[in-house]
């Protein structure tokens, strides 16, 4: 009798589950893919690094293939022509939505931030605010002094504490990029030396770390609904995390109202709130703050570390970049943002780093608002659509010797059109220009001010960390020697 009581409900569940899932995809001509297991689908196959696994699947099943994560259909695109088909015209409109995951419900204000909101009037308003009020060319130029100050602090620290010594770059680059964004948003420094308020800074760091650890689609309940019954602990955790971050951001807003801090994104948005409270509510401002401080930091720091790693592996490239800067800028002053236009080889180095080592190897997922076709296959409404940018950036059909670091390939202006570091279509990252400016200026300054060499002549480990963001598994260590320009800078 006990056996029947256990087996019968399980059998009924399996039958109901199979019926419910098959009814969602019945009659569709889905892209090919591996044979799924009952209930879990292909979850048992998904092992990091996922972008490399997906490239192997693409080699076997084609440039577009399908998987099943529990009850959710997943489609992965791995070719440039299919990406262009997906994100142009009406298809781009259909694919503007994001799939829903549990963390975003509680941390991203119930899917209302610019990164999570559904396509519609609310999202268009957020996009308008970003384009015109936060990340316009004039606004970014207005924050150039912040970028230059943070870079100068980094250069000074390297010169005084690490001249002729081994330095681990990742923590310093992370401090640089986090401080740049947080100062733009709030006017405060939370990382490195001379922080605004140590207690407040430590709380912010902990919240950011906890959100990053729980972000993405990491909870099985996102794919197997029955597990939500047993997953209340996780849901309570991310709910509490969202409430803690909201309280932190609200305190920053309230303090800014009282103190009237000038030339920050928050102060500018609060000034607009006075005339248009509907379009600049506290929730909208907090959502924009959250998006900037979470999404605007990782990419730049990761890209800078990969760029330096590639330069150490290719000293002839580093030498050529240094010669370009010395010729165009000299050693009497630091490279400045307006100089970047006259440093094409530096630009090519950054483009090649974006290509070979994208910080986000899989683009942020999309979800169609209605059924559509891609590559002749049916993509049902609600499917999780992923683009394997890493695989496309190494596609031998697009690139000569794709595994090699060769900045010269971007001397052909058409090459940059094949990059997709910041997404595609309507949901291209609104902070792309800011990220590029920061990486170019910081990398140019590091090349101009120091001679770099490997530690004891050892080869640079280029192994990837198996996470959603493609960091280096082994943090980059190098020896830096200050050049004469640093004497002038510190005088």
Curated annotation (Swiss-Prot):
PROSITE patterns the UniProt entry points to: CYTOCHROME_P450 (PS00086)
Pathway in which the depicted protein is active: Secondary metabolite biosynthesis
Primary subcellular site in the record, as a coarse category: membrane
Xref: Gene3D superfamilies: Cytochrome P450 (1.10.630.10)
GO molecular function: heme binding; iron ion binding; monooxygenase activity; oxidoreductase activity, acting on paired donors, with incorporation or reduction of molecular oxygen
Source organism superkingdom: Eukaryota
Record-listed heme binding positions: 429
Keywords, in A-Z order: Heme, Iron, Membrane, Metal-binding, Monooxygenase, Oxidoreductase, Plant defense, Transmembrane, Transmembrane helix
Function: Involved in indole glucosinolate biosynthesis. Catalyzes hydroxylation reactions of the glucosinolate indole ring. Converts indol-3-yl-methylglucosinolate (I3M) to 4-hydroxy-indol-3-yl-methylglucosinolate (4OH-I3M) and/or 1-hydroxy-indol-3-yl-methylglucosinolate (1OH-I3M) intermediates. These hydroxy intermediates are converted to 4-methoxy-indol-3-yl-methylglucosinolate (4MO-I3M) and 1-methoxy-indol-3-yl-methylglucosinolate (1MO-I3M) by indole glucosinolate methyltransferase 1 and 2 (IGMT1 and IGMT2).
Name of the featured protein: Cytochrome P450 81F2
Native organism: Arabidopsis thaliana (Mouse-ear cress)
Lineage: Eukaryota, Viridiplantae, Streptophyta, Embryophyta, Tracheophyta
Chain's gene name: CYP81F2
């Amino acid at each position: 009798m006990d056996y029947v009581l256990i087996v019968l409900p399980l059998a009924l569940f399996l039958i109901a589950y199979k019926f419910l899932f098959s009814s969602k995809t019945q009659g569709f001509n889905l892209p090919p893919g591996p044979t799924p297991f009952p209930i879990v689908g292909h979850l048992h196959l998904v092992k990091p690094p996922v972008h490399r696994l997906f490239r192997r699947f693409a080699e076997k099943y084609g440039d577009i293939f399908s998987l099943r994560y529990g009850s959710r259909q997943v489609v992965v695109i791995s070719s440039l022509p299919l990406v262009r088909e997906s994100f142009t015209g009406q298809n781009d409109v259909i694919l503007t939505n994001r799939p829903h995951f549990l963390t975003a419900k509680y941390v991203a204000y119930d899917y209302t931030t610019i990164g999570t909101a559904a396509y519609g009037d609310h999202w268009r308003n957020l996009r308008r605010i970003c384009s015109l009020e936060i990340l316009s060319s004039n606004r970014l130029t207005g924050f150039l002094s912040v970028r230059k100050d943070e870079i100068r602090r980094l250069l000074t620290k390297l010169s005084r504490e690490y001249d002729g010594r081994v330095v681990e770059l990742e923590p310093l680059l992370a401090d640089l990029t986090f401080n740049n964004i947080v100062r733009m948003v709030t006017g405060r420094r939370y990382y490195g030396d001379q922080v605004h308020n140590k207690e407040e800074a430590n709380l912010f760091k902990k919240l950011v770390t906890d959100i990053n650890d729980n972000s993405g689609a990491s909870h099985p309940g996102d794919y197997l609904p029955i597990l939500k019954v047993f997953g209340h602990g996780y849901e309570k955790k991310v709910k509490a995390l969202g409430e803690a971050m909201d309280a932190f951001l609200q305190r920053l807003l309230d303090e800014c109202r009282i103190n009237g801090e000038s030339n920050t994104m928050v102060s500018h948005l609060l000034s607009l709130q006075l005339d248009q409270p509907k379009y600049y509510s506290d929730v909208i401002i907090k959502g924009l703050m959250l998006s900037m401080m979470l999404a605007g930091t990782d990419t730049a720091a990761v890209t800078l570390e990969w760029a330096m790693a590639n330069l150490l592996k290719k000293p002839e490239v580093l030498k050529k970049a240094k010669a370009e800067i010395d010729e165009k800028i000299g050693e009497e002053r630091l490279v400045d943002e307006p100089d970047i236009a006259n440093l094409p080889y530096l630009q090519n180095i950054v483009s090649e780093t974006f290509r070979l080592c994208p910080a986000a190897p899989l683009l942020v997922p999309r979800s169609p608002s209605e059924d559509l076709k891609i590559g002749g296959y049916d993509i049902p409404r609600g499917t999780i659509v992923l683009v394997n940018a890493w695989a496309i950036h190494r596609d031998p059909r697009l690139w000569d010797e794709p595994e090699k670091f060769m900045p010269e390939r971007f001397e052909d202006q058409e090459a940059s059109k094949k990059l997709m570091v910041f997404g595609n279509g309507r949901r291209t990252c609104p902070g792309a220009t800011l990220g590029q400016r920061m990486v170019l200026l910081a990398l140019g300054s590091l090349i101009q001010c120091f001679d770099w060499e490997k530690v004891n002549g050892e080869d640079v480990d280029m192994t990837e960390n198996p996470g959603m963001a493609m960091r280096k598994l082994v943090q980059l260590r190098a020896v830096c020697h200050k050049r004469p320009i640093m004497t002038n800078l510190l005088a």
